[in-house]
Amino acid sequence: MISIRQKYKINYLFNIIFKEFFFKKKILFEWDNLPKRYEIINTIIQNYKFKKYLEIGCFKDDNFSKINAEYKIGVDPVSGGNIRKTSDEYFENCEDFFDLIFIDGLHHYEQVKKDINNSLKFLKKGGVILLHDCLPSS
């Protein structure tokens, strides 16, 4: 749960960083109405007409099952997705290229870095990589 003070700080920093470059008026997040991850991903898929989607880390399919892509691969060694491997194991034999890759796997710095580097090898030109939990404690 984010405190009111934290919300204020985030809104303040967001406006300092982005308002000057992108927006003409002050932007405030409506914290209770933020879109879900799958809504953001589906909007990107729809707007850019992406067809091939890869998700690294699909815990219980909370996100993966709601993705509307023609072709989707979900990699998780424990639960969710449609490939039961670690991301390292998957990328060793990967032959696919993806329009959109969502990284939400093991949340350790070294593994996140590996997942980003591996994803870049299999990202189509003009593709997008999204990260969740990109500030691990390690």
PLM regions with names:
Residues 1-102, 106-138:
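A short alpha-helical cap/connector motif
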